[in-house]
């Protein structure tokens, strides 16, 4: 029989941030004798889980997807928003071969360049600065017919905030002496993700036929008319923007169409309507053969040009374990199962050689404040059994409670969630020590430590940009290093396991064996 393994265990307490202030802090308010004792008596440090340190814009709050990608990659993984910001600033964007190729081809054929996307400073699906850069790119390369089709936000931005953005673009086109805003429509229609094709059809007709329910001379006038109809940005009905004497902006074969959203989920449906020959979501009144460019890859099965293809991550923690013939377990509840598998593996769906997975069903309740402990007892039972099984070199576990209950904004429930976690950590730490293993306890981002927004007095249901704890439990004599971040965790684990760190991992070990 094989020798019993002493596992390196990583426990991710989702949404468990560190905040000095005690007011509205569910983690401080909860009775947590176990975490308090570990923090007092074990090697520990605070690490960054937001902003530039995880590849997000400066000071932007972290999230679970980004957090787990960084945790597993062992390097800062730049998110699309940040990558584009950097490339535009460095002018690399303006030489992107896919974007320049599409513009140059349309220009030389005397065709139009259509640019569409969510005109928003929200930074969730797109950013208006990127759209502005695309307008500049088209103009710099000599395109004469530049048409902007603006999808309006009001979800990731205030409900009526599009006017300043539209003004900015109308002023830009006036300064360039060419191009114009050709249409406006709310994201409710253009960016559906639930196969509500009747909505998408209205956006498609507006774009391809230059036909809508309403028409206005300018984008701002069109928006003001929508507000007068009591439509907020998100729900603005299809509006053609065309002043007297202007040619219409209906799409023609051979035109270029650049879709400037970087997030995939709400970009897929309208893209398929343009790109798929066998599209059957609705009967297209006009099938137009445009040179369609996706800013990022919206789906692997959409066959059209991509300006920024996905960067594949080589030698993530999971892949490196497999290459070194190590066994690993990923375990969580439904809510965070994808995070400890797909995201931790750098966007790879299939498990690696030697990788087992355990999924514990999250409770079927309307909102998790009704059951703040969630399925933590069953998760802990399975995790402890795996630790003691001697089967695994490493185990990655996520407890969702701090985040999922934090999102409800209910302080009492968040306190109960944190107290439930304390019992779980106790059992896990004891199990790890009983088999001579090692344990790292951390979080992917903050949430439960800030349950009220001091500015508004309302419940704070979002993530925070605060640091998260990192604690070592084990028999090695280690010293903590300050100034760490999530991408230092994988190298830390490898170093504690006595393994080589692959060169692709640029993170540094945060616990040095003395």
From Swiss-Prot:
Show the active-site residues: 64 (phosphoserine intermediate)
- What Enzyme Commission number does this protein have? 5.4.2.12
TM region positions: none
The cofactor binding remark recorded in the entry reads: Binds 2 manganese ions per subunit.
Q: In which pathway does it act?
A: Carbohydrate degradation; glycolysis; pyruvate from D-glyceraldehyde 3-phosphate: step 3/5
Q: Does the keyword Metal-binding apply?
A: yes
Keywords from UniProt, A to Z, are:
Glycolysis, Isomerase, Manganese, Metal-binding
Question: Mind listing the GO molecular function terms for this protein?
Answer: manganese ion binding; phosphoglycerate mutase activity
Pfam families xrefs: iPGM_N, Metalloenzyme
Keyword Isomerase assigned: yes
**What are the GO BP annotations of this UniProt entry?**
glucose catabolic process; glycolytic process
Where, in this chain's numbering, is substrate bound?
125, 155-156, 187, 193, 263-266, 336
Database matches in HAMAP family: GpmI (MF_01038)
Q: What does this protein do?
A: Catalyzes the interconversion of 2-phosphoglycerate and 3-phosphoglycerate.
Name of protein:
2,3-bisphosphoglycerate-independent phosphoglycerate mutase
